[in-house]
Amino acid sequence: MKLKCSLTVRTYKADVRERVLAAIEQIAKGCAVAAGLPQDKMPEVNVLKTEHVNAVYNNPELTKRVAAAVKNAIGEQNVVQKSPTMAGDDFADFSLADHSIPACMFNVGAVDPVKAAESKKTGAPLPSLHSSKFLPVPEPTIHTAVIGMMATVLELTKK
């Protein structure tokens, strides 16, 4: 009999990722020992080093500039700072693992304001981006996103 278990491990820092991966292997083997498995039945933990996504790192100085430009363009009340999330995105690769290229990733709200207010009131989560129930409101979402991006481009290209 063979059991295969696949996991996605997400961390904000590479050293934490290495510790988590080592702990997974240690726990798997510890459980096998505790269950009395013979040596030839010990779990084999394979980590695919190439199959991971680095954490997105928003450069603080760049993020301040982008946030100020977007606030100026669409109104400060329409820009909120979000807590870090464990969402995986290959955007992280643009700044490289050492963050030597400044990057800033931001989201654009796309939910019906009535549903957003209801979610805030009740605590019920809204469907996430990859959910089949995610239903963005095209306008004003597209308009707002274009204004925000243009404000960012103008800020970052001014002399």
PLM regions and their residue ranges:
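Metal-dependent amide/peptide-bond hydrolase catalytic core
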Residues: 1-159
